[in-house]
Structure formats: structure tokens, C-alpha cells
């Protein structure tokens, strides 16, 4: 074959023929990727260049030889150069074929093996009824039971994208509805509430807000505390000179320096509620005792760094004006602190001691000296509290109590009901007995049935009183059914569907919230009965009731498994 001719030999013709039949001839004889071919080509080129340089050097070193010998040496050089060009061209063609194969392997996303069997056949599109040739990339429509032409198959892909977006949008909507249900926000929010949410969203631009007004401050504080956005910068929004009430619901990111600023900027505070104020130290509380002289309502939740001596100092300075006091989540409050509360806070009306590590019978007995108490909450104490200490307190101040919470006092028995609450607490409106697992159904039903209460209970929590059952539920309804607004029966596994049906049929004109979670007898039929027969009922909690599946049209139904 002439070196100047570009006509391919038999191999190229065979390659073209095999390529027309869809067969890659280069892949049959070579089992290495294109990169290896390039490396081998580079090596062969270097070898040939060395071979070609040999006759040239011979010609330069032997200039005295005749021209025939020189011509004999130069002819192979020309042939080898042509051969080298042909090899380069052949390898370039083969590399191009390999690149095309590689590209085709990466672009087979729409390839169909089902269409491969019918490739080349003529058919009519199942969608537009036009005639077309089936290719390996043609799509088969299961809904229309036929092959689709190229335009119709592209349209089917375009239609699938909005369907996917619609499904994602529906899933997101379901999540938002579930979150709103948990937050008890099922109605259309007011414009004022929407504005407050916008302010909370851009709370970091605090300097651009100006004067918002004290009325909406509490709502904004709740929202940004829920978002964990309350910090040293955003807390300044709530501090002003003429402010008399301040409630911060998450102070975990507020340092001691910012806690100092509360007393500096708001010296006229009368109500101060600080939740999760774990960074409060002795110096901060001492500063409050000296500068916040008008305090009457105080709540410190989680101030575990404040020492007992500083608590005593605070109550000595500010206790005479205190009307409401709440202390929770601390291990620094001992008997001496409780004694200071009793001695230095004679006007105390409301007292809440929750999750106090060293609260025991000795501390509780001292509370009998708070003669003016109307609300008493002793919840989840760290020490052991028995019936005797609670009975001593109730015998002294029980007649004046409107609110009593003994939640988490797990060692209390029926004696508290029979000798304390029943005979001594005739003015109670709010009673919380959550977690009192030693109460029995027979004794509790007798106490509630014979309880001579003046106006009836408005809220009652029997959550996790595991031994109570149908008798207690009936006695409670007979005693206070006409005044009950909130009833919590969460976890009372001995309550049957008969007792639930009794609640449905019993007249409860004031009932707004009912918790029947983890009661096996609760089902969809009872939900419908509550919805139709209890017009005042607004919220129904059904956590763990796996027979409640259907949604409610009117009630705020919280806790469905499919929610």
C-alpha cells in the first residue's frame, strides 16, 4: 500500500463493516482501556525514534562513503517514517473508536432491553397514533399498553417531574400539619400573631425594631425561646426602664454579664421569671437582692450554681414582698433555705418546689408555717416524702388551698387521700396526683365519692396512677363532673371502654381537654361519640391508642399513629 494513499486496508474495511453492524472490532482484539493505549503508543513512538536516529548518525559519521550506501540507509528511514505515521493514524482511529464506546457506555441511561428485542420494527404510538421505528431507547407505556414515539416519551418524562414535586409538596404539607397539631395551632393565625412570628424570625436585627410594646413581648419571648435564639444580643429587646414584668423562657445562652443587665436596665421589675438560668451565680442573685426592690413574683428554674447561703440572703432582703415563688432543678437548697422561706416570706401565696434534690420529709414539714398559701406544688422531690409529712402540712394549711400538686411523690399512699385531701381540702379547684402509683382503685373511689368539696374540681390529673380504674373515674365525674375543664387519665391502663363510654354519656358542660392516652379501649367510635356528644370539648389526646386511626372534623386530636 502506497504511503501517500489514504485508502484503508482490509482491516479498516472490516472495522467499518463491523461498526455498521453495531459491533466494536477494536474491543475484540484489545482488552485494555484507552489510557493504557495512550501509554503504549507513547512507548512505541519513543522506540521508533531511536531506531530512526541510528541511520542518521551513521550518515553523519561516514561522509566519505559512496552515495549508494547512503541511499541504502536513507530508504528505510523514509519507509519507517511512513510506517510510523500510519501507526499513529491507526491508533488515533482506534482511540477515537474507544472514546465513542466510552461515551456510549455513559449515555445509556434511557436504554431499554425490552426495546432491544423490537429494534427496527415499525409500530404506532400508543399515545398519538403516529408511525415510528422502535429503537433501543423507545419507552413502553404500561398505562396505555403500547410503545411511545420519541416526542410522547419525552412528554411522559416531563409529566413525571411535576408528579414528583406534587408528592414532595404533599409530604411537606403533612409534616407542617402534624407540627401545627402538636403546637395546637390548627386555626388560621391572627395578623398580630403573624407579625410577631416575623419579628421573632428576624430577631437578630434587634436594633431596627424600635419600640414594640410590652403587650406582645411575652409572645415574642416564647417564640424565640422555642427557636433557641435567645442570647446576649437578643435579650436586649426585652429590657427597658419602665418595665415591670419580664419572662424569659430559655436563658441557657445568656451569660452572667447579661443577667446582670436585667437588674441594671429594669430596676422596677415586679415579676421575674427565668427558665434554664444555669449560668446564674451568687453574684447575680446578690445583685438582684440589692437592686430589684419591687419584686413580688419570682421564678428561677435551673439556677443550680447559686449556693444555699446566697438563697438565704436573697430571701432575707426580698422575702417580705414576695407573693409567688418558684424554685426548680437545683441541689443547693437544703433545710436551712426552706426555713428561710418560711420565716422571711410571710405573705407568700403560691409556692412551687419542683425537682429539688434534697427535698425530704423534714423540709416538707416546715412548709406548714406558710399559713397564707393558696397554691402548693411539691413535685418530683429528690428525697423520700412519706404520708406523714404531707398530712402534717394539709392539716395546717389544707383548708385554704385552691391548688395542690403532689406529682412525682411516688411513696404516697391512700392515706393522703383518706386523711389529708378528703377531710382537709374542701376548697380545691386544681389537683395533680400524677405518678402516685400506690393509690388503689377502691380507696380512691370512696374518697372521691364522699368528698365534700365546695365548688368542684376544675382540673384533675391522675396521670400514671397505674392502679386506678373504672370506679375512680365514675366517682370523679359524680363529684366534679359539672365543673371539670381538664381531665387527665393518661396511662390508666385499667380503665375500660365501659368507663370511656360512661364519660361520653355523662354530662360535662365545662370539659375542654381530655387525655385518654395509653388506654386500650379507646377507638374511632368513641372519638366520634366525644365529637358529637361533647360540644365544649376542644382537645383530645390519644397517644398510644392504636385503635384510633380516623381524624376528627372538629376536635384537636393529638397522638394518632397515622398523624
Curated annotation (Swiss-Prot):
Compartments where found: Nucleus
Basic residues bias: start-end ranges: 78-90
Region (Disordered): 1-101
BP term (GO), one: nucleotide-excision repair
Location, primary (coarse class): nucleus
Highest taxon of source: Eukaryota
Any one annotated GO CC term: nucleotide-excision repair complex
Gene3D superfamilies the record matches: Ribonuclease Inhibitor
The entry's keywords: DNA damage, DNA repair, Nucleus
Keyword Thylakoid set for record: no
Biased composition range(s): Polar residues: 39-59
The family this protein is said to belong to: Belongs to the RAD7 family.
Task performed by this protein: Involved in global genome repair (GGR) via nucleotide excision repair (NER), in conjunction with rhp16, after UV irradiation.
Name the record gives this protein: DNA repair protein rhp7
Biological source species: Schizosaccharomyces pombe (strain 972 / ATCC 24843)
Gene name tied to this protein: rhp7
Amino acid at each position: 500500500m502506497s504511503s501517500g494513499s489514504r485508502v484503508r486496508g482490509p482491516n479498516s474495511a472490516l472495522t467499518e463493516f463491523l461498526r455498521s453492524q453495531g459491533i466494536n472490532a477494536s474491543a475484540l482484539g484489545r482488552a485494555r482501556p484507552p489510557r493504557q493505549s495512550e501509554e503504549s503508543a507513547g512507548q512505541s513512538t519513543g522506540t521508533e525514534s531511536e531506531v530512526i536516529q541510528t541511520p542518521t548518525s551513521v550518515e553523519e559519521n561516514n561522509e566519505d562513503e559512496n552515495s549508494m550506501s547512503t541511499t541504502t540507509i536513507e530508504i528505510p528511514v523514509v519507509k519507517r517514517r511512513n510506517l510510523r505515521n500510519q501507526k499513529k493514524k491507526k491508533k488515533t482511529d482506534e482511540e477515537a473508536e474507544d472514546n465513542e464506546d466510552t461515551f456510549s457506555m455513559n449515555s445509556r441511561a434511557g436504554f431499554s432491553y425490552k426495546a432491544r428485542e423490537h429494534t427496527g420494527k415499525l409500530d404506532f404510538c400508543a399515545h398519538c397514533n403516529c408511525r415510528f421505528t422502535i429503537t433501543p431507547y423507545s419507552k413502553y407505556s404500561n398505562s396505555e399498553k403500547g410503545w411511545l414515539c420519541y416526542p410522547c416519551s419525552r412528554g411522559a418524562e416531563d409529566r413525571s417531574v411535576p408528579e414528583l414535586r406534587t408528592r414532595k409538596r404533599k409530604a411537606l404539607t403533612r409534616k407542617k400539619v402534624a407540627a401545627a397539631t402538636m403546637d395546637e395551632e390548627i386555626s388560621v393565625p391572627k395578623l398580630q400573631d403573624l407579625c410577631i412570628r416575623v419579628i421573632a424570625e428576624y430577631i437578630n436585627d434587634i436594633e431596627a425594631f424600635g419600640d414594640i410594646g410590652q403587650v406582645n413581648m411575652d409572645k415574642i419571648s416564647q417564640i424565640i425561646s422555642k427557636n433557641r435564639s435567645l442570647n446576649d444580643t437578643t435579650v436586649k429587646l426585652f429590657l427597658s426602664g419602665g418595665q415591670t414584668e419580664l419572662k424569659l423562657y430559655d436563658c441557657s445562652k445568656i451569660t452572667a454579664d447579661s443577667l446582670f443587665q436585667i437588674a441594671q436596665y429594669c430596676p422596677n421589675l415586679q415579676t421575674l421569671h427565668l427558665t434554664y438560668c444555669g449560668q446564674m451565680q451568687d453574684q447575680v442573685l446578690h445583685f438582684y437582692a440589692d437592686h430589684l426592690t419591687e419584686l413580688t413574683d419570682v421564678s428561677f428554674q435551673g439556677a443550680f450554681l447559686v449556693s444555699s447561703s446566697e438563697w438565704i440572703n436573697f430571701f432575707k432582703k426580698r422575702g417580705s414582698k414576695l407573693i409567688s415563688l418558684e424554685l426548680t432543678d437545683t441541689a443547693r437548697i437544703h433545710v436551712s433555705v426552706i426555713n428561710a422561706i418560711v420565716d422571711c416570706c410571710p405573705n407568700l401565696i403560691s409556692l412551687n418546689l419542683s425537682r429539688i434534690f434534697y427535698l425530704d420529709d423534714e423540709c416538707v414539714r416546715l412548709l406548714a408555717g406558710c399559713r397564707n398559701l393558696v397554691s402548693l406544688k411539691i413535685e418530683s422531690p429528690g428525697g423520700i416524702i412519706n404520708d406523714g409529712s404531707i398530712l402534717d402540712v394539709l392539716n395546717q394549711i389544707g383548708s385554704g388551698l385552691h391548688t395542690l400538686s403532689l406529682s412525682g411523690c411516688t411513696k404516697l399512699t391512700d392515706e393522703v387521700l383518706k386523711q389529708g385531701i378528703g377531710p382537709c381540702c374542701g376548697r380545691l379547684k386544681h389537683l395533680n396526683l400524677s405518678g402516685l402509683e400506690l393509690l388503689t382503685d377502691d380507696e380512691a373511689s370512696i374518697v372521691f365519692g364522699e368528698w365534700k368539696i365546695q365548688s368542684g374540681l376544675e382540673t384533675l390529673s391522675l396521670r400514671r396512677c397505674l392502679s386506678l380504674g373504672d370506679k375512680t373515674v365514675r366517682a370523679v365525674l359524680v363529684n366534679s363532673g359539672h365543673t371539670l375543664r381538664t381531665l387527665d387519665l393518661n396511662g390508666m391502663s385499667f380503665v375500660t371502654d365501659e368507663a370511656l363510654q360512661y364519660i361520653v354519656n355523662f354530662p360535662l358542660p365545662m370539659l375542654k381537654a381530655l387525655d385518654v392516652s395509653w388506654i386500650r379501649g379507646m377507638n374511632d367510635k368513641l372519638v366520634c361519640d366525644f365529637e358529637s356528644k361533647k360540644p365544649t370539648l376542644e382537645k383530645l389526646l390519644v397517644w398510644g391508642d392504636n385503635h384510633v386511626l380516623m381524624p376528627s372534623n372538629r376536635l384537636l386530636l393529638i397522638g394518632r399513629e397515622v398523624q
